[in-house]
């Protein structure tokens, strides 16, 4: 779920305010996304969007009325390491790994302030 993704990003980047920092960044960070990613961070978001699209195609996710933004899962954070719980079902595990990989990606690439609230005409 979105609030868990927020927590994962805080785990990897404790100084961040994920919903403020990463929402409406570039062409893909935030709801929706199209065009060409503007940088590596935007590519992290594009990959995350594609991961959620794959999750929605899984049979184990089809029974859910929810979508990946609201479907919750179990994970833990210790010493900046994110672990998805083995108790997650197949769908939860998939979404957890989408979020985990994106949080790791965010922590490994530069943040360019000029790409925050980017006019989508540049996408």
Swiss-Prot record:
Active-site residues (renumbered): 48, 99
Enzymatic reactions: a 1,2-diacyl-sn-glycero-3-phosphocholine + H2O = a 1-acyl-sn-glycero-3-phosphocholine + a fatty acid + H(+); 1,2-ditetradecanoyl-sn-glycero-3-phosphocholine + H2O = 1-tetradecanoyl-sn-glycero-3-phosphocholine + tetradecanoate + H(+); 1,2-dihexadecanoyl-sn-glycero-3-phosphocholine + H2O = 1-hexadecanoyl-sn-glycero-3-phosphocholine + hexadecanoate + H(+); 1-hexadecanoyl-2-(9Z-octadecenoyl)-sn-glycero-3-phosphocholine + H2O = 1-hexadecanoyl-sn-glycero-3-phosphocholine + (9Z)-octadecenoate + H(+)
Sorted UniProt keywords: Autocatalytic cleavage, Calcium, Disulfide bond, Hydrolase, Lipid metabolism, Metal-binding, Phospholipid metabolism, Secreted, Zymogen
Entry note: cofactor: Binds 1 Ca(2+) ion per subunit.
Cofactors required: Ca(2+)
Function: Secretory calcium-dependent phospholipase A2 that primarily targets dietary phospholipids in the intestinal tract. Hydrolyzes the ester bond of the fatty acyl group attached at sn-2 position of phospholipids (phospholipase A2 activity) with preference for phosphatidylethanolamines and phosphatidylglycerols over phosphatidylcholines. May play a role in the biosynthesis of N-acyl ethanolamines that regulate energy metabolism and inflammation in the intestinal tract.
Name used for this protein in its record: Phospholipase A2
Name of the gene this protein is made from: PLA2G1B
